[in-house]
Amino acid sequence: MSDMTVKDFASKVGRDVSRLLEQMQEAGLPHKTEGDAVSEEDKQRLLEHLTRSHGGDSGATKNRVTLTRNTKSRIRSGDGRGKAIDVQVRKKRTYVKREPEPAEEKAAEETGPRQLVGDMASANQAKADEAAKAEQAAAEQAAKAKAEEEAAAAAASKAAESEPVAEAPGAPQPEEPETASEPFVEAPPKEPRTPNRRGQNHQKKDTGRGRKRDDDEERRERGERRRGNAKKTKRSERRGSRRGGGRDNQHGFQKPTQPIVREVAIPESISVADLADKMSIKANEVIKAMFTMGAAVTINQTIDQDTAAIVVEEMGHKPKLVKDDALETEVLEGISYEGEEITRAPVVTVMGHVDHGKTSLLDYIRRTKVATGEAGGITQHIGAYHVEHESGDITFLDTPGHAAFTAMRARGAQATDVVILVVAADDGVMPQTVEAVEHAKAAGVPLVVAVNKIDKEGADPDRVKNELSQYGVISEAWGGDTQFVHVSAKSGEGIDALLEAILLVSEVLELKAVPEAPAKGVVVESQLDKGRGPVATVLVQNGTLKRGDIVLAGLHYGRVRALVNELGKRVEEVGPAMPVEIQGLDGTPEAGDEFIVVADEKKAREVANFRQGKYREVRLARQQKAKLENMFSQMGQDEVAKVNIVLKADVQGSLEAIRGALEELSTDEVKVAVVSSGVGGITGTDANLAVASEAILVGFNVRADVSAREIVEREGLDLRYYSVIYQLIDEVKQAMSGMLAPEWKEEIVGVAEVRDVFKAPKIGAVAGCMVVEGTVYRHKRIRVLRENVVIYEGELESLRRYKDDIGEVRSGMECGIGVKNYNDVQVGDKIEVFDQVKVERSL
C-alpha cells in the first residue's frame, strides 16, 4: 500500500482524481499530481479531515452509538367482532460514553452527600439491570394477557402511538435510577438534539443498561405531557422530541432602540401603497399622515413627487427625488448633430388680430388663394409654407387670430425665428395683437411689424406706432429696434420691403443647421386622415428627414412611409427649415411636440411606451383630490346642470382650441363637460358613447360614418356639424342658457290705501280702500304694509264695488278688499298687489 499512487487510490475509493486532489490539499497534504505516492499516514489524515468537514469529530463518533429496535405484536379488540390490531413499536436510542475525568478533580469536587448518592446509585444499578431483563423477557406475554384491558388505549392512539402499548409490565420500577444515572448521562451540549447522521459508527453497548432505563422513564414522562395537549399533531410531537422540545432554542426579534431613518427614492409619481412600502411601514399610516395634512387619499391613489416628498419628511425619513427620464436621456445622448454647418432659411410666423389680413398678406406672397379655402374666411389651422424669393428662401407659419387659438399662437412663436406682427392701419392694436407681442417676447423672438391695409381710407400708421409703443414695441424711427413696414395685401405695396426686412433680421441672427445629421424639429399640426391614417405636419429645424427614418414624436413613434410637401408632392427627403407632412406614425401627436429621428426602432417604442405611462400617471395625479377644504363644495355639485359633449375635429390644434373654449364657458350653474375628444371622423364608438353619457355629438370639419348615422337616427341623438368656431361656441351658449333655472321677478301692479274698516258676516274684516296706484286684481298675491313695513303676505280673497264682485279696480276708484285669513286690517294701512313674472336667463 505504500507504493499506491493518487490515481490508484482514487480508483479504489471510486472518486474523481481531480476532486480527490482538491480534498487532499484541503486536508493539508502535499500531493499535487496523480502520480504522487499515498502512505497510510496520508490516508489517516485525509479521513480525519473528511470526518471533521462533515460535522463530526473523530473522537466523538467513537463515544456515541445509536441503536434501533422494532417490536411487533397483535392485540384483539374487546367489542366482540374479533378484530385484530397490529402494533409495531419502534425504539431508537443513542448512547454517549463520557470521557473519564481526572480522579483528583473528581475527588475535589464531590462532597460527602455526593459520594453517598454515588454509592446508592451503584447499588441500585444491579437492580435496574435485573428489572430490564425481566421486562424484555415478559413483554410479549404481558401484551397478550392484558390485550382486552389495553384495547381502548390502543385504539385511542390509532395503533401508531410512539409509546408501546405492550410496554406495561407488572414488575416494580425503582425510582432511584433517575438520581443514580446523573453522573452517567451528562453528555456534551448537543445531546438534547439527537443527531441521525448516515455513516455513523455503530458500536456495541458496554454499560448502557442503566442509562437505557433512565431514557425510557424520561420518554414516558414526555409522552404523558404530549398526550395532555390535544392540539399537537404526531408529526410535531416527533419533531419536538427529536429537537429537544425547543427549550434551548430561544429565538426572537429585538425592537430597535432608535428610529430607523431611510433614504426614500421618489419618482415623479407614486402610489400611496408603493410609498409606504419604500418606507417599510403600513399604508394606513401614510393615509393617516396625509389626512392630518389635509388630503384624503386611498391606498391605490397616485400622488405627485412634491406631495410624496412632504409626506416622507413628515414621517421622519429623507426624500430623494428621482427623475424617470433616464431612458430618454440615453436615446437623446446617442444622437450626434456634429458636422458641416450651412446657413438655413428663416422660419417666420405671421401673427396678429383676426381679420387684420395675415392670410391675405401671405397669400399675396405665395401668389395663391388660401383665405378663400378657409371656412368663414378666417384661419383655423397653422399653415406651413415654403417660399422661394430671389433674395433667399423663407418658411412661413400662418397662425389663427381668433381668441380660442391662444395655444396655437404660442406654439408658433416657439418654433419660429422671426415674428411678423400684422396690424390693420384702420383698426389699430387689438387684444390678439397684444397677446402676439407677449408670445414673441416670451419666446425671445425679434419682431417685424407689418402695418397692413395702408391703402384704405382712415388708415393711421402713426396711431399703430403710438399704441404699440405702450407695450414696449418701439419703432426704429423713434429710436427703437423694431422695423415697421407699411404694406397692402390687396395691392402688393411694400411686400418686397417686408421680405427684405425679414432677410435682414435673419442675417443678423446667423441661422445655421447641419444637413447631414438626423432630423429633429417640432410638430406643427396633426390629423387623422381616413385614407392615409395619422398624418403630422412637422417643421424640420435641424438635420435631414428621409423616407424610411424612424421618428419619435411625443407619445408616438413610427417609420416614415411618405413625405408630402405643402404643394402635395411626394419627396424623398426634406432639409432644415422645411415644412412637410409625414405618414407612418402610430397615432396623432400633440401639436407642439418635438420630434427626433432615432436609429433603433426598439428604443423608440420603449421611449414612447414610457412617455404614455408617465403621461397617464401625471394625469391621474393631477385629477381633483377630495380635500377637506372643498368637501362641502363637492356635495352640491350633483345639483349643477351639465352639458355633455362628444367632440371630434379634423386637426389636433383646432381640437385643443375648441375644447379649451368650451370648458371656459362653464359657470357655477351650468358645466360644460367634454366627455370625449379626438381627431378624425365620427364613428359608431363615438355615437354609443354619446348615448351612454347623454351627450351632444359635435363634428368640426368632420362627418359621421354609416354606423354612427344609424345609431344617431335610432337613438335620436343631437348631431351637429360646424366649420366655423364662432357658430359652435354660440350654439353651445344657447344650449347652456336653456338649462339655466329661470328667474322670477316680482312686479307691483297696484297699491290701495285703507280708508275704513267694517265687518261683514261671512267674510270678516273688510277694508274700504282707495286705489292710489296701478290696478288691483282679484286672486293675486298681496302684502299688507303698515308704516312701510310688511306685516302680512297672502292672497286677495274678495274684491267688491257697491256690493258687486268685480275682477279689477283701477286707480282713483273705491273698493272693498277682503284679505284671506287676516282680520287685523287698520285704517292707514296700504295693500300692495303684486305679480310674479318669469324671466328667461342667458349667459
Swiss-Prot record:
Keywords: Cytoplasm, GTP-binding, Initiation factor, Nucleotide-binding, Protein biosynthesis. It holds the Pfam family GTP_EFTU. Residues 377-381 are annotated as: G2. CDD domains: IF2_eIF5B, IF2_mtIF2_II, mtIF2_IVc. The keyword Protein biosynthesis applies. Residues 452-455 are annotated as: G4. Residues 29-55, 96-112, 203-227 have a biased composition (Basic and acidic residues). Residues 26-260 are annotated as: Disordered. Residues 60-70 have a biased composition (Polar residues). One of the essential components for the initiation of protein synthesis. Protects formylmethionyl-tRNA from spontaneous hydrolysis and promotes its binding to the 30S ribosomal subunits. Also involved in the hydrolysis of GTP during the formation of the 70S ribosomal complex. This is Translation initiation factor IF-2. It comes from Chromohalobacter salexigens (strain ATCC BAA-138 / DSM 3043 / CIP 106854 / NCIMB 13768 / 1H11).
